[in-house]
Curated annotation (Swiss-Prot):
<keyword id="KW-1133">Transmembrane helix</keyword>
<feature type="transmembrane region" description="Helical">
    <location>
        <begin position="249"/>
        <end position="269"/>
    </location>
</feature>
<dbReference type="GO" id="GO:0005886">
    <property type="term" value="C:plasma membrane"/>
</dbReference>
<feature type="glycosylation site" description="N-linked (GlcNAc...) asparagine">
    <location>
        <position position="312"/>
    </location>
</feature>
<feature type="transmembrane region" description="Helical">
    <location>
        <begin position="414"/>
        <end position="434"/>
    </location>
</feature>
<feature type="transmembrane region" description="Helical">
    <location>
        <begin position="317"/>
        <end position="337"/>
    </location>
</feature>
<feature type="region of interest" description="Disordered">
    <location>
        <begin position="1"/>
        <end position="36"/>
    </location>
</feature>
<dbReference type="GO" id="GO:0022857">
    <property type="term" value="F:transmembrane transporter activity"/>
</dbReference>
<feature type="transmembrane region" description="Helical">
    <location>
        <begin position="110"/>
        <end position="130"/>
    </location>
</feature>
<feature type="transmembrane region" description="Helical">
    <location>
        <begin position="382"/>
        <end position="404"/>
    </location>
</feature>
<dbReference type="Pfam" id="PF07690">
    <property type="entry name" value="MFS_1"/>
</dbReference>
<feature type="transmembrane region" description="Helical">
    <location>
        <begin position="200"/>
        <end position="220"/>
    </location>
</feature>
<feature type="transmembrane region" description="Helical">
    <location>
        <begin position="169"/>
        <end position="189"/>
    </location>
</feature>
<feature type="transmembrane region" description="Helical">
    <location>
        <begin position="141"/>
        <end position="161"/>
    </location>
</feature>
<feature type="transmembrane region" description="Helical">
    <location>
        <begin position="278"/>
        <end position="298"/>
    </location>
</feature>
<comment type="function">
    <text>Efflux pump; part of the gene cluster that mediates the biosynthesis of the cyclic tetrapeptide apicidin F (APF).</text>
</comment>
<comment type="pathway">
    <text>Secondary metabolite biosynthesis.</text>
</comment>
Length: 562
């Protein structure tokens, strides 16, 4: 514990001598962070409440269908297309994140956010009224588009409307709601479907959306753009602003991401990784990614994502932190309920309840760390904390076995949740602090995209290791087919003799703990970012990036570096 304390309480070192690449071409002594224009604390709290509610609705909409799929597929008599009930939403949400970064940087954030909520509500309405599977899938895709704007927009607006030193705690609160939505979505969906019908899972979004829109219309007054950006946009018509969106680049990025997500969704489950369809998707993704990168670099400031931001060392390191912490957390959240059900033989509902230790840890520690970061004035100490605690927690989860005590798996969850939850929130705030005010939307959408892709990528990697163990089980127990083993193992536990059950349970345990090993590796990688993250102060009302740039002699001598 002494080492942990030393790591989290280390004094802030002087500004590193090695400069970072500047994210802007000029700076002025008059450039300041735009202070919130919310007139009162009550109004601000209402706005944060509405933004949090919107994010929660967006995340719940993604996870609530997990327990509804069999019921909806039965109603529509369309089992073959049921996999798209969840995938359509997630694919569109992930693929359109970069586009919304460009939209938020071009148009007024309040208008874009309210429009995103409206799109999400339209998608929910289509799902609630759907008479067949294609209509329902279309509604899910529409809702996913709205959710992309809502989830990233909530964090962007929070960054624009809260003082810099208070931003970590507000971001932690909103980010914690995402974790809550992931856990409680399937539980709420099952309860609503069994009591009043699955369509009410979507009807209920409409009054919630109306309430939060009313709050934001009257209480949200986000700051205007910087004078430079206002001058740049002055006199431009809507048509000219739409032309700025780099639609061809945005669509190319969305297409490339869609190919990757489809390959990860289908690979190893619907089709083997060696299947031609999976190979084609991965090849198209790789080629299109190279083409998109060249196109975005060539477009410069007109691109969907300005590639110059990647030259900012602190921004890139916080992106890496987001990738690692989110990848680890998604992997654990995906496989830990499976461990409870398959290895310990509990129900799906009970496995969700057993995750509460991690959920509470993520919420409580993330909020405390966010408030502490604002008080301390620097983010790096909390990245150290996140790396240490998440690595220890993931390492402990790797030691899970069928006869482990309840106190241990609860304690391991608390450690991992505290570290990974803090790490994800610090990454979100970190990318925002590392860039100038006008680049905040790009930075936020980038880290949200990275978080989304991390979950898909590392769950797929873990699944490959897991399926390898399952293959050995079917070889040892010939009468146990692979499909039943993977989809309905709990229901057949009583049909296996003692020896067969031991073989199957231990194989499940080995396969799932290998997934936790992936989480351990990811969390440990973040230690490499420690010496590379710049100690940017959070307590200044002035733009910290520009302030550091002016006060660093080497920066001034370098001209275009910070």
């Amino acid at each position: 514990m002494g080492d942990i304390s030393a790591a989290t309480k280390a004094p802030a070192p002087p500004t590193p001598a090695t400069p970072e690449t500047n994210t802007t071409s000029s700076s002025s002594d008059t450039d300041v962070q735009h202070e919130p224009q919310i007139p009162s604390a009550a109004s601000r709290n209402l706005v944060i409440f509405a933004l949090g509610l919107a994010i929660l609705v967006g995340v719940l909409d993604a996870t609530i269908v997990a327990t509804l799929v069999p019921t909806i597929a039965d109603d529509f008599h369309s089992v073959d297309s049921s996999a798209w009930y969840g995938s359509a939403y997630l694919l569109v949400t992930g693929a359109t994140q970069p586009i919304f970064g460009k939209i938020y940087s071009t148009f007024q954030s309040k208008l874009v956010f309210l429009s995103s909520v409206a799109i999400l509500e339209v998608g929910s309405l289509v799902c609630a009224l759907a008479k067949n599977s294609p209509t329902f899938i279309g509604g899910r895709a529409i809702a996913g588009l709205g959710a992309a704007g809502v989830i990233s927009g909530g964090l962007i607006i929070t960054a624009l409307t809260t003082p810099l030193k208070q931003r970590p705690v507000y971001t932690a609160i909103l980010g914690s709601l995402e974790g809550v939505g992931v856990i409680i979505g399937p539980i709420i969906g099952g309860q609503i479907a069994s009591s009043i019908g699955w369509r009410w899972c979507f009807w209920i979004n409409l009054p919630i959306g109306a309430v939060l829109c009313a709050i934001l219309v009257f209480c949200l007054h986000p700051p205007k753009q910087t004078p430079e950006r206002e001058q740049e946009q002055a006199g431009k018509t809507w048509t000219q602003k739409l032309a700025q969106l780099d639609l061809e680049g945005g669509l190319a990025i969305a297409g490339s991401i869609t190919c990757l997500l489809l390959a990860l969704e289908w690979g190893g489950t619907s089709y083997p990784w060696s299947d031609g369809r999976i190979i084609v998707l991965l090849v198209v993704f790789g080629v299109s990614l190279i083409c998109v990168a060249v196109h975005q670099h060539w477009k410069g400031e007109a691109a969907t994502f300005p590639t110059r931001l990647l030259k900012n060392r602190t921004f890139s390191m916080f992106l890496l932190c987001g990738l690692c912490f989110a990848g680890a957390q998604f992997t654990v959240l995906y496989y830990l309920p499976m461990w409870f059900q398959a290895v310990q033989g509990v129900s799906a509902a009970e496995s969700g309840t057993r995750l509460l230790a991690m959920v509470v840890s993520v919420i409580v520690v993330s909020v405390i760390a966010g408030g502490s970061a604002g008080a301390v004035g620097y983010l790096p100490p909390f990245v150290f904390f996140a790396t240490i605690f998440s690595s220890i927690g993931a390492g402990m989860l790797y030691t899970l076995h069928p006869s482990i005590s309840k106190s241990k798996w609860i304690g391991y969850q608390i450690l991992f949740g505290a570290g990974s939850g803090t790490g994800i929130q610090q990454a979100i705030v970190g990318v925002q602090v590392a860039v100038d005010h006008d680049d905040m939307a790009y930075a936020t959408s980038a880290v949200m995209l990275v978080n989304t892709l991390a979950g898909s990528i590392f769950i797929a990697v873990s699944q490959t290791l897991f399926l390898g163990e399952m293959k050995r089980v079917t070889e040892l127990i010939p009468n146990l087919d692979r499909h039943t083993l993977l989809s309905n193992f709990r229901s057949i536990r009583d049909k296996l003799d003692h020896q067969e059950l031991d073989i199957a349970v231990n194989a499940y345990n080995r396969g799932i703990t290998k997934a936790f090993l992936i989480g351990l590796v990811l969390c440990s990688i973040t230690v490499l970012t420690w010496p590379l993250i710049r100690w940017i102060p959070l307590k200044k009302t002035e733009d910290p990036v520009k302030s550091e740039r002016r006060n660093d002699p080497e920066t001034l001598n370098a001209g275009n570096v910070a």
